[in-house]
Every structure is written in C-alpha cells, then in structure tokens.
Amino acid sequence: MVQSSSRLAATFSAQHAPEPALPRPGQSLLDRIGNTPLLRFDQLTAHLPGVTLLGKAEWHNPGGSVKDRAAANIVAEGRLSGQLSPGKILLDATSGNTGIAYAMLGAAEGFPVTLCMPQNVSAERKKILSAYGANIIYTDPGDGSDGAIRMARELAAKHPDLYFYADQYSNQANWLAHYHGTANEIWQQTEGRITHFITMLGTSGTFMGTSRRLKELNPTIRCISLQPDSAFHGIEGAKHMATAIVPKIYDPKLADADIEVATEDAYAMCRRIGRDCGLLLGISAAAGVFASLKVAEQLELGKEIVIVTILCDSGEKYLSERFWTEK
C-alpha cells in the first residue's frame, strides 16, 4: 500500500524529532540565594538545659550575607515596575553588605551600580566592591550610614533620569524578602518549635519581615530586636535608632523587647565563637549570639526553648580589625 506524502512526512518527523530537552545542570546565582542552614551552638548552651541556640548562617548566600535576599527582591521589583530600566544606574546607600549584593547582581545581570558608603567600612568590603566593578562614593565616617543616605538622596534628586534609587531603608521589597523567605525557612527548619527570634537592626528589614511572618505562624514567638548601645559604635551595618535616620520600614511596636549591645561584647563574642566553636562570625552576628545567650540565661530552664538568631555574615570581611588578636 502506498502511503500519502503527508503520512510519510509525519512518520519521518516522528522518527527524527529531537528528544525533549533535559533540565540544565547547575544553578544560577539567584537560585543560590536563601535556604541557608541553621547551625547549633551547643558549646555555648551546655549550662542551659532545654535551650537550643541556632544561628541562620547567611554567609552561605552567594554574596556572603543576609543582604542578598533583600537586594535580589529590590532588583526584581525594580525591573518589574520599570524603574530599573535598561541604561539606568542602581543607586543606594550602604554600609557594605547590601552594596556587595547589588554589585554582585549588577555584574551578573548587566546593570551599573553606584553606592554611597562611609569611608571607614572594612578594607575587605571595599576590595570586594571594587572586584565587582561598582562605583563607590565615600562619605564622612563621622556621619555613619546617615551620611551615606543623605548623599544618595541628593544624587537621586539631582539626577532622577540617571538613577534607580533603590532606597533599601524605605523599600517594602526589603522586608518582604524576609517575610516570604527567611521566616518560612526558619519555621520549617525548626519544625515550628522556635520560641524566640533575635536579630540586630540596621535597615530593620530582616527583623520586620521575619517577625511579621513568624507572629502569623505562632503569635507566642518572642521577637527581640537588638541595637548598638550608643551612636558611636563598631557594629558595622547596625543602627542606634534614637540618634539615626529611622528607616521608613521600621515599626518598633513589632518587637516584644529591644536589647542594646555594646561593641566590646560583640567583639568578645566574635573571639569566643572563633576559638570555642570553630566559626568566624561578623560583628553583628556575634552580637546576636551574645544577646541570645543573655535572654536564655534569664528564662525558666527545663522546658524546651529554641532561640534563632540571624548570622548576617561571616568574619572574613572583618579580619583586618584588631579585636581578633586581643586577649
């Protein structure tokens, strides 16, 4: 029997059709943001029966800090809204980690980045930003992060067509990254057993977003914010709210308590964790562990307590600081 030309063509096409494409191996940069591990600090809580102290190790993000989460969401929302359009420069004020995240994303996705930051940020942060090709405008170290904010606002107002002003201190995409990501990860990783959430305030996005979602999941979770104990401190990225420009996304009513941490206590905890736990933590991360221990020591012991703090970054960006070698 002679087959029609159309049937022959169909048979040939079926026999020689390309096989379905397999999923591509590997992951993109964005795929690696989030889902960071929880690390136990059993060495520090041996004298506290029933207490589990956990730190969310945010240096496992590709940019090395918790700020990858907010930066990626801010960039995504900027593109979606059309504000970060082709040819525009992303502009923001930063104490370092968010800037590193912006610079990393800009290099990967092809948009230029200009950052305003205090001159006295760690040497390691400056080198990382240069390696990513970001344009840096340094501000007076005495003005802290507020000086960088004022500079960024001035540039954005003067050149609105040139810049997409990301404004992490006011951008709702900042805290929403933690509402949808960080909080749900913590809930799942602790199997809903978390009793306390403790972290340092900077932009306040991590605390705001994570606390809002955790309170929805279990209103009895105690959410405790941390601040430096004075306007002049050495905890990079942290804000002393009473003397600083208060971020628009910050709502103090969300905290069940607020604890002040001295720079010296954070430094001492950096050293202790390095020598007793084998982890090099950033200064604000160590401040979180210090405060978490203080909270745990004041609780009624014997019942299960699960405290989670955010380890914002590792100590690698601070190794040029002198406190590591102090006794």
Please give the residue ranges for each predicted region.
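PLP-dependent amino-acid enzyme catalytic core
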Residues: 1-327
